[in-house]
Amino acid sequence: YCNVLRNSPHEAEVGSNAIEAMTRGGYWSKSSKTATNEYRISIEGNPYPHALALTNPVGDNLNIKRHGFTGPLGQLLSLKYTVYDDTNEKLFTVVDGGFSNMPRVALVIEHKEVAVLDYGLNRLEMKCITNIPNYSIKGNFLFGDYDIFSQREVRVSSVTVLQCDKQSCFSIQVFDKAELAAAIGIPTAIALLRARIEEHLE
């Protein structure tokens, strides 16, 4: 599911009537290139089209450039949002592949893919915390048999990357585990919300 990031398909500008990217107030450390970064991503849809909202680093003015990835037949495969600060320094990139049957979002920092989120519910909020830009996360987030047209809402409080030698674990912490399990109808929901991290080979 990460192929859209690795195959470098043709990039085309997306018109203003496409999915909108919005910024809201949030936390950011100006020296965060070597420190721990915090972002929150909100994906909303009914189920399509959906909007991608990014937290705004400490209220700074951000320049968001939106591009569309197109396939060999010209079909829109995904959207890429590249976020710059007011000095035109690249902060991070979000790739939204939500135009397939299984929507997905990838967060890319300094050309390193550090978090990939597959989602199918109407709304999912995620906060990614990472300080290992040289590692790439691979794997699916399994939500079981859910209805992507439902109006149910699931909130994920945080995503934490824990490194253990070369084998790392992608751990998700949830505000209310019972509420999450009930929302997706799977008692073992928390156990399924995992992915493996493999060392970035590029």
Segments (PLM) and residue ranges:
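Low-complexity or membrane-interfacial segments used for flexible interactions
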Residues: Y1-K80, D86-L91, F99-V105, I109-E202
